[in-house]
């Protein structure tokens, strides 16, 4: 951040405009956070009630929730502050060259990306190790105590996602109310350019870029990052439970390798992103969008490849060579080599990259989907909108096929732990992804500062090149976030099923099927409320802008000064008022369904929200992004039916109308879907102990584990081992037969198990088994070694 602040901030007028944008954004955030303090207080009381009702939910979850909410708000605030520092400096850099403008705008994005990812890793790591110190005492089974620790950590994720939802929805309503109002009256009715200082809504529009596309996005990706890592850690605990069935699990990481792995991958991803940021540069002052995009892609791919290489070594180092996992629907434990976990992680990285490519195809300048919308603009706004809707709907096909392949492939390789690791690997380069995403709004703001400061035309041309690339990277980033949300939600869903102790979700039950449909409806209603909120706020903005054009003399001539503050106030009040209902629906609905209908119907509801939410997110994000770049195509000029069309033409006005429809799609309701999906599953996970069999004498859940541990001291255990060792390869395979007697004259319960892996791993597990046995018989490569008892 210090480097960004050292750059020249421009002349006095540029600094004044930048200051107005910063003050407006800060004023909104202060008002928003003041309102959210009330929500955090009420939610903390509710979590306190849950901790009193359920033994396995500790009161510390309240503190974790508050810290998560604070960190999420801080992530958005940090992003907004750096963006408002970088906007005028980017415009000033654009006076000299395009490479300098990219360097400053991407530098601002880098600070935000590294700050958000660093906060996520720091918060998760600190709280996790504090909770491990508090709860892992050895008084109960490791799984039981770790479950309590991770349930407390879920409070951190719940706090982060809750604030992210309100920040995303509130910021989206703010920015699009201003944007739609500015476009409809300024561009379409008055015929003045975007960001023209004569437009009363132009400051509000630029403030909106920061509170929505920067602060909202920062909180959003912070929440996504935390939820993804948490889901993988929870499922890592289940892996340890499965592997402890035959013998106590031991490793060099305090018996926590599968749990710590996603956290370590996240940390390595931050380091890989730092290296990637150094590769983002261009040399030519005549570079166009393609060269800028290539520079960003180079840095992104470098971060992805470095993360993939590091993941291979981390997985080999932190996981046993083989693991036993219980798959749903399979009676016996499945032996999973650690390399399968690596393959699952690579599926996550590959699918994340492929979905980014699919999103880029449907939303980029010069690609067929965008050109189709451009051609349809020649016959008016109606055909433009029809074409945009079709593009958004068609874009779901390839994205969903890729999601499905990722889920099926990663689950087949390593169960739900594989799915969670796929999501973790995908999100590991969040710092780089966020740096790329954030540079777009900074460049957009820089263009606004240049226009309002009446700088030379070449400055705006350079910022427009960056802004155009930023529109595509923003759409790609949203597609990336949806992909991770889908995989994370599935992992959280698996954790929910295990936490509650239910066998699965049976849709042949009437209540489950009914709630499945209710869940499918929620994203539709949520989107409708968000769109309606933007429409209502935009109407207020349009009326105010028209009033000022009519009543303030000299605005169009440039001699009168618009009342910018009134437009800023309209957006602020509308956003704060309208964000409450969608947020409360998201949080309260799963609680009511869970308490009234029970665990399985709530599972049906969660499944409905996930499937429907993913479809609506892809459709809205891609349709909005395509409409936006269809409008921008006219700035350079496009050929329609043999005739060149430019800004100001009837076709361009139709494209502006389409973009105005798409704005709330891509910046308000669309991006909120991935938070809606994850937050629904997180709420279910937090209330799962109330709905499930925690503390009951059942065959599933935490109580079973505790009961078995306590019972094990009352039985007589005899163990027979037949081990084959390959000394050259350093691997071993042991067939273990365990005889458990309730008393010396009773009939034994016989259990058979195969332990395979490196020689050190197998011997460590056999030693743990030996310590728990009354009689231990070992045969190694066909010869008896010892018999103790």
Range-by-range predicted roles:
Residues 1-704:
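Hydrophobic packing and interface segments
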Residues 699-789:
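Short linear regulatory motifs and low-complexity interaction segments
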